[in-house]
């Protein structure tokens, strides 16, 4: 084993445990320092989000004979750095090695392992985690960089995630209520940039809607809420330079008269926007098209509002139908994505095997050259001291043969004990040739 991932996510662990094992930026740097100082691994990348914490490690000195011991050491370190109970952690922890580890990372970065299938934010989080490790090892590694193996894995992963986005429709359809509401608005109106949009409420859903709209360059945004202070706090959280009008619900009729789009999500037990209120607004607007998206449960908008001329009225049930359709599309796209990931992870694993054996061959040749030079130097010294030439050459050839076949002989003995018939057959063919 050279590459290992171990972690927990939203499918294996509770929110409480996920919070305990989360890495802040400061703790992440401490972890990388510990991993280097204890020689737990050559290098590591730590991914920590609200839904998962994963550590990707590379150790070139770990093989089949000691991989379980190394895994146990990594799990113990994981528990120790977060000061959590080892058995509690083990019950929620998953681990993958080499080929499966590379496949897991590619699935994560492509959004196939996310709470919301195909969500795009995770790729940016994986890139950020990689960049933090890259910066750390550029300053603190003996070779001034991350290991070739782990770096290659992440670069391959980024290319794979891009391929998944390009060749499938995994991220094209809205699968959250807030995003679906904004997508619906973009479908009905060619551009949102110069429209007046009224958001009613100041909760989490309206916050998500606000962020989606601001990303699409909306200029005329207004928020109406029962308490102005909560609306003001929402605007502060958005951290935008865009001017956002704020007013209380008693001025709702004024806001409706200016609104091209109304998206509402409050906790009110009663209807806030009556058909009559919308009718009055439409008269003032000369019946220009108005989109109303009512995300609230119970409803904020009177059910018959959609009967008014030029009013497009959608409820949360309509959005859920859209979302379910989109989820089905994403699931179909995920099958294509899995095929791409299977190809790319297999390609990486083939490279990894070739790279490992290239290092093995190079190291063996370097070792043989050191042995040759050492024995030659001793033989030349013996000749200079007047020793018998034939005896010196006999001793040189004997020692050279003995030293050169020592490591291969040990390897064969290990293969015999392990019952590795394929390895022995390959070695036998090589010797015969």
UniProtKB/Swiss-Prot annotation:
MF GO annotations: glutamyl-tRNA reductase activity; NADP binding
Binding site for substrate: 49-52, 114, 119-121, 125
Signal sequence interval, chain numbering: none
Positions annotated to bind NADP(+): 201-206
Catalytic residues identified in the record: 50 (nucleophile)
Entry's EC annotation: 1.2.1.70
Highest taxon in the source lineage: Bacteria
Chain segments annotated as coiled-coil in the UniProt record: none
Site (Important for activity): 104
Catalytic reactions of this protein: (S)-4-amino-5-oxopentanoate + tRNA(Glu) + NADP(+) = L-glutamyl-tRNA(Glu) + NADPH + H(+)
Keywords: NADP, Oxidoreductase, Porphyrin biosynthesis
One Pfam assignment: GlutR_dimer
Extra facts: During catalysis, the active site Cys acts as a nucleophile attacking the alpha-carbonyl group of tRNA-bound glutamate with the formation of a thioester intermediate between enzyme and glutamate, and the concomitant release of tRNA(Glu). The thioester intermediate is finally reduced by direct hydride transfer from NADPH, to form the product GSA.
Subunit structure: Homodimer.
HAMAP family reported in the protein's UniProt record: Glu_tRNA_reductase (MF_00087)
Protein purpose: Catalyzes the NADPH-dependent reduction of glutamyl-tRNA(Glu) to glutamate 1-semialdehyde (GSA).
Descriptive protein name: Glutamyl-tRNA reductase
Lineage, uppermost ranks: Bacteria, Pseudomonadati, Pseudomonadota, Gammaproteobacteria, Pasteurellales
Underlying gene: hemA
């Amino acid at each position: 084993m050279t590459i290992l991932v171990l972690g927990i996510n939203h499918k294996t662990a509770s929110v409480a445990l996920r919070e305990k094992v989360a890495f802040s930026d400061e703790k992440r740097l401490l972890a990388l320092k510990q991993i280097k100082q204890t020689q737990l691994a050559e290098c590591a990348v730590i991914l920590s989000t609200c839904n998962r914490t994963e550590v990707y490690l590379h150790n070139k000195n770990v093989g089949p004979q000691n991989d379980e011991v190394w895994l146990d050491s990594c799990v113990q370190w994981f528990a120790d750095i977060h000061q959590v109970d080892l058995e509690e952690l083990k019950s929620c922890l998953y681990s993958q090695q080499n080929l499966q580890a590379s496949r897991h990372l590619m699935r994560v970065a492509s959004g196939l392992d996310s709470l919301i299938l195909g969500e795009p934010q995770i790729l940016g989080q994986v890139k950020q985690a990689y960049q933090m490790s890259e910066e750390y090892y550029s300053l603190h590694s003996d070779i001034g960089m991350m290991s070739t193996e782990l770096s290659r894995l992440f670069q391959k992963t980024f290319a794979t995630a891009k391929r998944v986005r390009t060749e499938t429709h995994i991220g094209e359809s809205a699968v959250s209520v807030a995003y679906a509401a904004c997508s619906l608005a973009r479908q009905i109106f060619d551009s949102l940039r110069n429209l007046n949009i009224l958001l009613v409420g100041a909760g989490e859903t309206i916050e998500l809607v606000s962020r989606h709209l601001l990303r699409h360059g909306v200029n005329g945004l207004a928020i109406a809420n029962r308490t102005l202070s909560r609306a003001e706090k929402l605007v502060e959280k958005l951290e935008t330079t865009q001017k956002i009008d704020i007013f209380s619900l008693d001025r709702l009729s004024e806001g409706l008269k200016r609104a091209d789009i109304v998206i509402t999500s409050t906790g009110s037990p009663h209807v806030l926007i009556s058909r009559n209120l919308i009718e009055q607004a439409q008269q003032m607007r000369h019946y220009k098209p108005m989109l109303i998206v009512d995300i609230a449960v119970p409803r904020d908008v009177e059910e018959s509002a959609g009967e008014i001329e030029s009013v497009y009225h959608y409820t949360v049930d309509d959005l859920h139908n859209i979302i379910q359709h989109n989820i089905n599309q994403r699931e179909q796209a995920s099958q294509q994505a899995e095929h791409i990931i299977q190809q790319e992870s297999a390609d990486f694993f083939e490279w990894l095997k070739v790279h490992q054996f290239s290092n093995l061959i190079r190291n063996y040749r370097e070792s043989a050259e050191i042995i040759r030079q050492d024995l030659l130097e001793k033989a030349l010294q013996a000749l200079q001291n007047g020793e018998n030439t034939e005896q010196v050459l006999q001793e040189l050839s004997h020692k050279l043969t003995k030293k050169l076949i020592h490591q291969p002989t040990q390897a064969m003995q290990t293969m015999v004990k392990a019952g590795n018939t394929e390895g022995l057959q390959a070695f036998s063919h090589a010797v015969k040739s």
